[in-house]
């Protein structure tokens, strides 16, 4: 009862082909809905959903469920505008900032499969993730801050794109204040630009065993 279902499952476990088990396989839901919308439906929209507290920059901020859903549903619309649909893959190569959370939940909202790659990872490692995932869009930031240094992401991303055999169709880059970088249109656009004409979108219905994300170990 704690999980929202568009269609409640009648079968809990399919164990006919172990070890490839399927859970709730006839159920239909959405992980973004269960992370955000359900809490708003239950009257908790004004409660805090996300706290950002950076020990490097000292920046602090809080987002309610309503605020976070608004950001997520609009960026989900921005992804749609860039051609991302259900089943498409999106690589998220970002520092630990609120926009990274927004990007992940936005993918879940529209049924896209996200793959988080540690921000600052070497170009060859990022290239291998691009090739393996066959990502349509890469979401990144201009830089990341680590103790005693700034890691410029754009050169790393540019090199990874050159190295990868699979070519992404679009890059969406979040410009960090004071560390803005030049973008090459039309394949590269800023986070803010992607949102300029985007409309908020609702959650798509997902079968329980459809992919949500790719996590490399």
Residue positions per predicted region:
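Structural preference for long, well-ordered alpha-helical segments in enzyme cores
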Residues: 31-35, 72-75, 103-104
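Adenylate-forming
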Residues: 36-40, 68, 72, 90, ...
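Conserved AMP-binding/adenylate-forming
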Residues: 22, 78-127
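Structural core segment of the AMP-binding/adenylate-forming
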Residues: 109-193
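Flexible, non-catalytic linker and terminal segments flanking ANL/adenylate-forming cores
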Residues: 1-35, 39, 175
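Conserved pre-ATP/AMP-binding loop-to-beta segment of ANL
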Residues: 46-48, 171-174, 184-216
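Glycine-rich adenosyl-nucleotide cofactor-binding module
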Residues: 47, 52-79, 196, 200
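AMP-dependent adenylate-forming
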Residues: 35-64, 174-182, 212-214
């Amino acid at each position: 009862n704690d999980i929202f279902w568009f269609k409640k499952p009648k079968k809990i476990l399919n164990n006919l082909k172990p070890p490839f088990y399927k859970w709730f396989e006839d159920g239909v839901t959405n992980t973004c809905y269960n992370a955000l919308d359900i809490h708003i439906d239950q009257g908790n929209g004004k409660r805090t959903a996300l706290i950002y507290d950076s020990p490097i920059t000292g920046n602090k901020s809080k987002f309610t469920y309503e605020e976070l859903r608004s950001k997520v549903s609009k960026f989900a619309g921005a992804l749609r505008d860039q051609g991302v649909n259900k089943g498409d893959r999106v690589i998220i190569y970002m520092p630990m900032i609120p926009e990274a959370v927004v990007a992940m939940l936005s993918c879940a909202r529209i049924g896209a499969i996200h793959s988080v790659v540690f921000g600052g990872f070497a170009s060859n490692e990022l290239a291998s993730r691009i090739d393996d995932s066959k990502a349509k869009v890469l979401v990144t930031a201009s830089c990341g801050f680590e103790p005693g240094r700034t890691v410029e992401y754009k050169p790393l991303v540019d090199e990874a794109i050159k190295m990868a055999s699979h070519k992404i169709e679009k890059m969406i880059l979040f410009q960090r204040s004071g560390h803005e970088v030049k973008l090459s249109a039309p394949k590269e656009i800023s986070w803010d630009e992607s949102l300029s004409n985007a409309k908020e979108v609702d959650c798509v219905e997902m079968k329980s065993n459809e992919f949500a994300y790719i996590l490399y170990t």
